[in-house]
Amino acid sequence: MGEFYNPDKLYKGGSRNNSLINKKMIFRVLGVLLFIESAMFLLCAAVSLCYGEQDYQYFLYTILLNTLVGGVLLICSRGAENRLTRRDGYCIVTFTWFLFTLFGMLPFYFSRGIPSVTDAFFETMSGFTTTGATILDDIESLSHGLLFWRSLTQWIGGLGIVFFTIAVLPIFGGGTIQLFSAEAIGVTHDKTHPRIDVMAKWLWMIYAILTIAETVLLMIGGMSFFDAVCHSFSTTATGGYSTKQASVAYWNSPFIEYVIAIFMILSGINFSLYFMCLKGKGKRLFQDDEFRWFMKSVSILTLVITFALVFQNHYDWEKAFRRALFQVATAHTSCGFATDDYNLWPSFTWMLLIFAMLSGGCTGSTSGGIKNMRLMILARNIKNEFKRMLHPRAVLPVRVNRQVISPSIIASVNTFFVFYLFCILAGWILLMFFGVGIIEAMSTVISSLGNVGPGLGAFGPAFSWAALPDAAKWILSFLMLIGRLELFAVLLLFYSGFWERR
């Protein structure tokens, strides 16, 4: 992927080819990525064979179809110029998630593990976007190969979004994408590495280390190797798919709950901070404004809910703290695991969890939501506005990590926040139009747009989303996609000006 996103080869205004979209280059990238997905299918087929299951044949059917389409795309890409424009970049990231979902649903559908096209697409989109919402009412009935593929979709999706947000977005710049630029707000901390491909390899290595470390700890806690790997895939990606219908509560193990809660939080932190730690600059982690904001929020919400569970639900202190920490970590990092039915908790705690869902994790992590960096900039700008009302002539810049945030970045944050709320409102109204209850509609929309997983009411952590109307599932699948790709990266393709030369 490094050669495709080499900034030295990006279109700067003068090119031998004046076409608006470099279709051949897009075909080449998508073709290569489909071959990579085929390799993942092959791995899942091997898992099925290891367990003596017949589902391997459905993965082989999918591989044949996948490689055929990938091959056609590569043939069509012959003679492609090795350059990409901003438009090409937006097309690639959107089409990649869509095509991966389209082909990724086929093993579920071919095996009849999920016999409905709508449900299979929803389940796979929920996986690749690391949302974790499921339509399955009997997860254990799936074969090991399908369960492995289900968790692997989340690990691939999380891996992809780390590369997308830290390596790809800063190249393109502009609008909300500037939010991730080192020049804009120092998110990548002195340009983590000058070469995008090298930086991506380091980030993927960190991603793999977190996954392996958690797998080992979960096995120590009593999980089988298969379950430990699948849950580590889901945790590191902040996805939330489990191999059990009861999710993590199935094991009823405090050790396992603490391990997963800690790794959810670790996965919600900006991955470039880990890179700085590896370079011997560990102080940067604790000096980072977003990291401190995120940890304060997790700590405060956990303590408040702990007291509520002790004094209103009569939990003992350790259990209350453990359940509160786990569910706050799940909501704040947009992971979909559950150890308790929070529908039975005091109602005010639902609002705290919704706040955590909206906030999400840190920029440059696998988590979803609005992101703490945006909320921090928004809050500091509001604080400055109050000061400006008292001191009209005062110069009050917004600072993050001691760097002044430009007015254009502040404007992009405000725009993103307003548009995020608009998407919630629009999705909420649409779901109620199709017969979903007011609380359920609100929570499933927030959960889907923030890539969280569980909602409230009939679609809370104790229930699947199978009862949703098909139309609602397609709407929520679209919200998952735009939420995963930061709204504008997808919606820009529906703007007429995107396809016009101006």
Listing of model-derived features with the role each one plays in the protein:
Residues M1-R502:
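Membrane-proximal intracellular helices of multi-pass ion channels
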